[in-house]
């Protein structure tokens, strides 16, 4: 690295200055016009003090890297900033300029080899929000990062951080904002097995792309940046244009006050892979930043304002119809929302052309009948028009009908006004559906790998030491493990068609701030031959121990091809993956004076089981009536009575939603049962068995189990729900 700096030494004569601060100011003054000369000055500064930080300009290494960047030596600039960050970190410092420049440039260049380090530096920037010495200049540098974060944060988290106030007022209004945002980002990490936060890296890559393509120098991010950061690259991106010869001849040539350059620029984005309602029209007026709008925002306002029955109003109506037909044609090609209205507009615009041609032909027929002495040779255009007139004949004049399009016949101005009014209502309704159905954030992380559908059920139990033990059972059908088209393609590329599989399940145990405490891993082989029959895999157990407060769990299940050609066999390409989060789990109450109860653990009831459980765990959310269902639970902190025994009542309530049949609403049916028990231990282990045979019309079922301590009078309850299939 320092060889690089020596290579920048372009002169053996020191500048006529007598301090590092003066040298630094001299170098800054040379930018951006003279980066090579500035680099020479900055090299001298860092050779004397590599960590020099100016009170006014910040770290000298930032400015040296900036000079290299302007000299198109991006790789050297990034390497220099990396070294600078490490040197300053050794002294407990973070230079905001270096950190911000490094994060921006890494992700703007999409330098994936540096994504991990870039994400770490970004988190250091967020941590600065808790620094009491944070100043306005630092907040100004953090502004784009905070703005992009505000687009994806859940509203509750944004409100807790008062992110809107932080962005607008450029001052911290709530304590612990940095810790809150860092904890939230840790919660978004989808793959606990890796050391990197892939979702954070994806976000920063999107922000880097937005900084490159969707930023106005004066006004910052436009609305395209917001949608891109939220949803990623669109399935289809179309630049909307009305620049074609037909419109020039039919519209712009006839209206001198209306010019092509006056029309707003437009883009149409479609996210078909997310939701059918995920479609966005962006409009840029007068070269201002793109903003979300509708197709009607792409028309000049003065064109829409004067539509009426007058000659001028009819002329504007015909122009609006033709421009809308062109725009709707481009929109309808990419989204069905605009299809029917495009048909109406295109049909009417075609009729306008035919009407004009008919009028033109009639005029030429009359002209032909009036002119008896024509020259032997006519110019080509006159001859063409006369030929057309003779072919068309004289159209019927008067009593002219307008195209009904299945509706009442309308002249141009009424048709245009109706199309505009109905179109605006239609697009407003589409925007409402979009707000309702399109997720706030969409990730593309797993698009290159098939999903692995698994069933999961967890239950919390209280251990003797007062900590909570969480038992997580998962399973999947044989069909779920079968490779799909994408997985088969990967198997073919690896030459492993017909291979068996290795399934790795990892349970990440996280503390309240989403820091990973422990990883629990289990692996099992899945044989290709076993997947040809119907059935499900035996439930696999993963267990987390030692929790005492708020905690979080993440389950990651990955399916690999198993390469048996090596000894020992090794995992091949990744074929399928799933990641499931369990946020904000609360440890059970360890206070011995408070009655407590475990979660309900569903079992496939088998009284012949010799295990501690009367059956095998049933992790599926759906039931059929042939499933012998049992619910196992444990009771803690029962109170001894005068006879040195515990006395408690267990009741359960089954709420079934049954199909009402033809013309009848679904109805809810409830059944209740109570049993009194006594024991000699403060901890009891119980289970109840449910008979599903009578649930012939049930569509869903909810079971509430209540335990009441007859000595202390305390009560505790747990609930579990299932869907029921015939």
For every predicted segment, state its role.
Residues 18, 23, 56-57, 63, ...:
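Structural signature of alpha-solenoid helical repeat junctions
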Residues 18-51, 66-72:
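Alpha-helical segment of the N-proximal tetratricopeptide repeat
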Residues 46-55, 86-95, 134, 138:
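Flexible helix-coil transition and linker loops at the boundaries of alpha-helical arrays
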Residues 63, 70-76, 80, 92-95, ...:
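Residues within mature, well-folded domains
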Residues 312-726:
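Intrinsically disordered, low-complexity terminal regions enriched in Ser/Thr/Pro/Gly
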């Amino acid at each position: 690295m320092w060889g690089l700096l020596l290579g920048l030494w372009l002169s053996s004569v020191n500048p006529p200055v007598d301090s590092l601060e003066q040298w630094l100011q001299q170098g800054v003054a040379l930018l951006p016009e003279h980066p090579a000369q500035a680099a020479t000055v900055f090299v001298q500064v860092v050779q004397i003090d590599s960590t020099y930080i100016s009170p006014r300009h910040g770290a000298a290494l930032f400015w040296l890297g900036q000079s290299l960047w302007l000299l198109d030596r991006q790789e050297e600039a990034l390497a220099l900033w990396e070294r600078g960050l490490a040197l300053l970190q050794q002294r407990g410092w973070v230079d905001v300029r270096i950190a911000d420049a490094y994060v921006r440039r890494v992700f703007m260049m999409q330098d994936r080899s540096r994504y991990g380090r870039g994400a770490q530096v970004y988190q250091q920037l967020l941590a600065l929000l808790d620094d009491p010495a944070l100043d306005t200049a630092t907040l100004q540098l953090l502004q784009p990062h905070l703005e992009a974060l505000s687009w994806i944060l859940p509203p509750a988290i944004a409100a807790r951080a008062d992110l809107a106030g932080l962005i607008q007022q450029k001052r911290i209004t709530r304590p612990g904002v940095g810790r809150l945002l860092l904890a939230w980002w840790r919660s978004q990490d989808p793959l606990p097995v890796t050391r990197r936060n892939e979702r954070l890296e994806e976000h920063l890559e999107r922000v880097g792309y937005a900084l490159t393509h969707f930023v106005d120098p004066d006004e910052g991010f436009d609305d395209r940046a917001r949608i891109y950061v939220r949803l990623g690259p669109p399935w289809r991106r179309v630049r909307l244009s009305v620049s074609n010869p037909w419109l020039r001849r039919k519209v712009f040539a006839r209206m001198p006050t209306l010019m092509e350059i006056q029309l707003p620029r437009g883009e149409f984005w479609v996210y078909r892979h997310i939701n059918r309602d995920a479609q966005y029209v962006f409009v840029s007026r007068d070269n201002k930043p793109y903003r979300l709008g509708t197709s009607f925002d792409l028309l000049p306002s003065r064109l829409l304002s004067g539509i009426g029955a007058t000659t001028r109003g009819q002329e504007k109506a015909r122009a609006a119809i033709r421009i809308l037909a062109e725009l709707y044609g481009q929109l309808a090609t990419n989204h069905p929302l605009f299809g029917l209205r495009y048909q109406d507009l295109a049909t009417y615009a075609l009729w306008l052309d035919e009407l004009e041609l008919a009028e033109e032909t009639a005029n030429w027929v009359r002209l032909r009948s009036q002119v008896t002495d024509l020259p032997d040779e006519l110019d080509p255009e006159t001859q063409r028009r006369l030929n057309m007139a003779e072919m068309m004949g004289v159209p019927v004049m008067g009593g002219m009908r307008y195209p009904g399009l299945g509706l009442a016949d309308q002249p141009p101005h009424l048709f245009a006004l109706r199309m505009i009014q109905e179109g605006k209502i239609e697009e407003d309704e589409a925007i409402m559906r979009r707000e309702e159905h399109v997720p706030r954030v969409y990730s593309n992380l797993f698009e290159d790998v098939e999903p692995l559908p698994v069933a999961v059920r967890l239950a919390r139990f209280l251990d003797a030491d007062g900590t909570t033990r969480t038992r997580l059972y998962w399973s999947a059908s044989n069909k779920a493990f079968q490779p799909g088209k994408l997985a088969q393609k990967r198997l073919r590329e690896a030459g492993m068609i017909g291979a068996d599989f290795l399934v790795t399940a990892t349970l990440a145990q996280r503390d309240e701030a989403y820091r990973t405490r422990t990883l629990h891993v289990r692996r099992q082989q899945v044989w290709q031959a076993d997947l040809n029959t119907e059935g499900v895999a035996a439930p696999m157990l993963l267990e987390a121990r030692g929790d005492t407060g708020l905690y979080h769990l993440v389950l990651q299940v990955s399916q690999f091809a198993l390469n048996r050609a090596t000894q020992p066999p090794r995992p091949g390409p990744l074929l399928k993956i799933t990641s499931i989060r369990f946020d904000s789990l609360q440890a059970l109450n360890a206070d011995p004076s408070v009655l407590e109860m475990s979660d309900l653990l569903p079992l496939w009831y088998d009284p012949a089981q010799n295990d501690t459980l009367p059956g095998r765990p049933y992790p599926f959310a759906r039931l059929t009536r042939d499933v012998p269902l049992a619910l196992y639970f444990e009771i803690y902190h029962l109170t001894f009575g005068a006879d040195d025994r515990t006395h408690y009542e267990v009741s359960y309530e089954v709420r079934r939603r049954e199909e009402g049949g033809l013309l009848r609403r679904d109805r809810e049916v409830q059944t209740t049962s109570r049993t009194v028990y006594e024991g000699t231990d403060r901890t009891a282990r119980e289970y109840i068995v449910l008979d599903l045979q009578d649930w012939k019309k049930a569509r869903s079922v909810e079971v509430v189990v209540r335990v009441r301590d007859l000595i202390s009078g305390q009560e505790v309850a747990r609930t579990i729900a299932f869907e029921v299939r015939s």
